Amino acid sequence: MSIISFVYFDLGGVVIRDLTIDENAWSRMKRDLGVPPSFDQEFDAYYDKIELLVQAGADIDSFLPEMAQKFHLTFPIGYSVLTDLTSRFHKNESIWPVIDAAKKIGKIGLLTNTYPCLLDKIKQANLLPAVAWDVIIDSSIEGTQKPEARIYEIATERAGVAPEEIFFIDDRPKNLAAAERVGWQTFLYDPRHAEESSQHLMLQFMHA
């Protein structure tokens, strides 16, 4: 293995268990919102479109009126997508020893496509390990997101090491492919087999 001086972790699907851990989790959320199965495809396309805007800094809850009108939904007073999502997330304690191991061989950071204020909600829910991240790259703050080249340029600069010394853990192949194009080392994490993925990472870091 090449030298590792900095490890970037993805947030959802790696450091925490989000809706990717269960193929039915997103469907359950849609049913809870009142989206009928017959509208699934249309709702998914709509959500994918607005999510790109949200991950670049737009407020997800600002889309609720449009969402309600478009899909004939009724949201409770005070409803927040951020709060709802956070309540459906869980700790991924299998990754915690991996983060500790990474901290021993270099610096660590988060590199995440996320929504404004969602990381704060996740912290408040105590879903993260008690660790001091050296760098946090939040797409909603940077205005660019994975797999766009710019976010990897920013992350490389803030890591302060050569690109080939950066190790990146993510659960989406397209994000890893973009990282490899700038010279990073990568690992594809499987959120549906988190314990197994974490064990493989531990073995790699033990020999780093």
Language-model-detected regions and their locations in the chain:
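Alpha-helical elements of Rossmann-like donor-binding domains used by nucleotide-donor carbohydrate transfer enzymes
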Residues: N24-R28, A45-K49, S62, E66, ...
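Hydrophobic alpha-helical core bundles mediating ligand binding, dimerization, or RNAP-core interactions
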Residues: A25-M29, L64-M67, L82, T86, ...
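Generic structural signal for small/hydrophobic residues in well-ordered secondary structure
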Residues: D10-G13, A56-G57, A102, L110, ...
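Short, surface-exposed acidic
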Residues: R31-Y46, F71-L82, P163, A208
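A metal-dependent, Asp-based hydrolase signature
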Residues: K49-V81
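Asp-based, Mg2+/Mn2+-dependent phosphohydrolase catalytic module
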Residues: M1-F9, Y115-P116, D120-A208
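Active-site neighborhood of HAD-like aspartate-dependent phosphohydrolases
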Residues: M1-A45, R181-V182
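Short, acidic loop-to-helix structural element flanking the phosphoryl-transfer center
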Residues: P76-G109, A149
